């Protein structure tokens, strides 16, 4: 039997700085999709607000959640620094975008549609 883990992840910006715009979140989502594919994982749903993001990810047991999270946060942070967004550059703290912590919750038997609905209902900044 093939097992896939499904988790909700939440990452917050360092000091809860309100740095995300719709444009930035779109680029963050693209970087998350790329990272997930390298880990043989899938970004099922993504949404964010000005100071945090919600992800619904599935991944195989051979991948550790901490390795996936570290890569998601590291790659997206480097991408944002490289693009030098005016709205963010002055708000980065020692070049850190993300808080070092994260929230992760396994989804057990919860229906994916309900989890997607929860993430979709987050308020995306304009």
Model-found features: residue ranges?
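Basic nucleic-acid-binding interfaces
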Residues: 1-126
């Amino acid at each position: 039997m093939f097992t896939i883990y499904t988790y909700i992840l939440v990452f917050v910006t360092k000091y809860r700085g309100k740095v995300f715009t719709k444009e930035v979140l779109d680029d963050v989502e693209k970087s998350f999709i790329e990272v997930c594919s390298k880990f043989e994982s899938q970004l099922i749903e993504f949404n964010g607000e000005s100071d945090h993001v919600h992800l619904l990810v599935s991944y195989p047991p051979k991948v550790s959640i901490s390795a996936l999270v570290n890569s998601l946060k590291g790659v997206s942070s480097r991408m944002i620094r490289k693009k030098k967004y005016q709205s963010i550059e002055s708000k980065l703290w020692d070049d850190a975008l993300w808080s070092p912590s994260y929230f992760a919750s396994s989804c057990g038997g919860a229906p994916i549609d309900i989890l997607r609905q929860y993430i979709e209902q987050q308020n995306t900044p304009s």
